[in-house]
């Protein structure tokens, strides 16, 4: 909700850059851009509509340049980018320009499920790689840790 309010001015889950999936009862999984260090979405764009914001480390989409071809959607290992339901332009988390509204709302609400992790100089940043997976894969891994051998029955 915080994401769509920040970017759209209203609660609009279809336009939210953070998706939340409940794939196992009582286990909701946020799915958002990991701001991958190698960012395969950026070079996949044939018109260079995606760029790094050097101040925030976020991947930014130039809506004027985006042709809605979907190359970045296919290149993302986590399947995160999507075409905005109104503009049909590629949409990716832009970290709200520095302090993500989702992380702020999550902390203020006492959930502590999202937080901002400063980009590591290492190419093996676990915090970023966790979200660069599909919701099904993240949920399967979390369910396995929480429920052990019975996880497959729940999924």
What are these regions (language model features)?
Residues 1-24:
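N-terminal cysteine/histidine-rich coordination modules
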Residues 5, 46-47, 77:
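The C-terminal cap of the DNA-recognition helix in HTH/winged-HTH DNA-binding domains
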Residues 12, 27-30, 55:
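A generic, residue-level signal for flexible/boundary positions that often mark functional hotspots
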Residues 17-20, 24-35, 42, 64-155:
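Flanking helices and flexible, charged tails adjoining ferredoxin-like Fe-S electron-transfer domains
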Residues 36-58:
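Ordered, amphipathic secondary-structure segments that act as subunit-interaction surfaces
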